[in-house]
């Protein structure tokens, strides 16, 4: 019983400790740039609604990144699908001396609901994203694993008698375990694109995405005070995607 009381006292003291810290400087930085993403994916369908996906994504300067994804999806009923994926991220601008710097790991857990209305197909996807930080970090400033909820609403219109579809998307990123000062929306991703169903197995997509990114960086000084940096990025992205289904 004594331990339980001490534990609750500790919880009550945490907000006091945070409030006692003083933000001695607060800076804002912003950048705007354009980049291209090239994506190739292979999807293998099995019985009982199972699908296996392998995907490679290359991002151009200034990001210089590559994402390799392996995932599995299960459609239990016509309107709902569940999936999970592992993503290996490679950063080309971090140097090649330390794998903890240029390699990162991510896990995605998805639930998607969709419905068809004539030529329209509407879907809502909720994704829990776990982003792992490797190497040495200050755990008072950053998390070893960031938890982010990504909510995406998508509308697809199939042009009658044509192998073409127009696709519009809106995705919102919400932090779930940000350090201090509460959670916040970290990304907004409106997107518009055109899909061409070449044949039964091959699909091409061309899209434009505007990516608003906000991050809040906290630095704890030796004195115990804080410096707070608000970082904004505005990205204009062209995406070219090829998918092979079998």
Pin down the residues of each PLM region:
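Outer-membrane beta-barrel "beta-signal"
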Residues: 111, 232-246
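Hydrophobic/aromatic-rich structural module bridging two neighboring secondary-structure elements via a short loop
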Residues: 64-120
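Repeated loop/turn-to-beta-strand initiation elements of outer-membrane beta-barrel proteins
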Residues: 46-53, 79-84, 118-122, 161-166, ...
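Bacterial Sec-dependent N-terminal signal peptides
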Residues: 1-26, 246
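Membrane-embedded beta-strand positions in outer-membrane beta-barrel channels/transporters
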Residues: 39, 69, 108-110, 150-154, ...
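Solvent-exposed loop/turn segments connecting transmembrane beta-strands
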Residues: 27-36, 57-67, 178-185, 232-233
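Outer-membrane beta-barrel transmembrane domain signature
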Residues: 125-225, 229, 243-246
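Outer-membrane beta-barrel initiation region
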Residues: 21-45
